[in-house]
Amino acid sequence: MSQEATEAPAMPGEGHGHNKAKARWLLGTDRKRSRINRTRQDLWEDTSWSNHRLSRATSAPRGTRARGTAHGRSEASPENAARERTRVKTLRQAFLALQAALPAVPPDTKLSKLDVLVLATSYIAHLTRTLGHELPGPAWPPFVRGLRYLHPLKKWPMRSRLYAGGLGCSDLDSTTAITTGQRCKDAELGSQDSVAAESLLTSPAFGNK
């Protein structure tokens, strides 16, 4: 009995040790969890930082490429400007040469490109009719027929004839054409009358009278 009484008080001590071991186990579990959480957080931070650096590294070539493209454009723009100036100069020289080839136009006349084209069309049509060839199309296209109303008489006194047939009579302005034709006929009749009068004065019969 005394031995049982002596061993009986040992039970509470064993329970306290068990509780203490359980507390240590729980503390160790909490520490492991906190370590795992810290590890996960560190991994997340490292991953986000790596992604950030990767995005910056990816965007850097784009910016460099954009700056390179802009730099290339700035280098090419003077060449484009030079080509455009050359094209405009060549076109202007061609129109000046075409205007110089047209008769009945004073050398220092200032005409627009449209005026030069209308005069050239009129002159070509006049030469075609003079050679007895038929025109491949209408002598005056519809867009040319109304130009006399868009271009009033300006720097050149003969400009009114520019849209009245230029060098010849056309159906662009019938009134001007009829007037010009009548003047030509009057000039021809006057020359014929003067020739007849001279022949009459120099004839022997007139001298005998």
Curated annotation (Swiss-Prot):
It is found in: Nucleus. One of its GO terms (molecular function) is RNA polymerase II-specific DNA-binding transcription factor binding. Its main location: nucleus. Residues 75-127 form the bHLH domain. GO terms for biological process: cell differentiation; decidualization; muscle organ development; negative regulation of muscle cell differentiation; negative regulation of transcription by RNA polymerase II; positive regulation of gene expression. Highly expressed in the uterus (predominantly in myometrium), ovary, and testis. Expression in the uterus is higher in the diestrus phase than in the estrus phase and reaches a maximum at 7.5 dpc. Expression declines towards the time of delivery and returns to the non-pregnant level 4 days after delivery. Low expression seen in lung, heart, intestine, and spleen. It holds the Pfam family HLH. The keyword Disulfide bond does not apply. The keyword Nucleus applies. Gene3D superfamilies: Helix-loop-helix DNA-binding domain. Keywords: Developmental protein, Differentiation, Myogenesis, Nucleus. GO terms for cellular component: euchromatin; nucleus. Residues 1-20, 54-85 are annotated as: Disordered. It comes from the Eukaryota. Residues 72-85 have a biased composition (Basic and acidic residues). Both the bHLH region and the C-terminal portion are essential for inhibitory function. Inhibits E-box-mediated binding and transactivation of bHLH factors. Inhibitory effect is similar to that of ID proteins. Inhibits the formation of TCF3 and MYOD1 homodimers and heterodimers. Lacks DNA binding activity. May be involved in the regulation or modulation of smooth muscle contraction of the uterus during pregnancy and particularly around the time of delivery. Seems to play a role in the inhibition of myogenesis. Forms inactive heterodimeric complex with TCF3. This is Transcription factor 23. It comes from Mus musculus (Mouse).
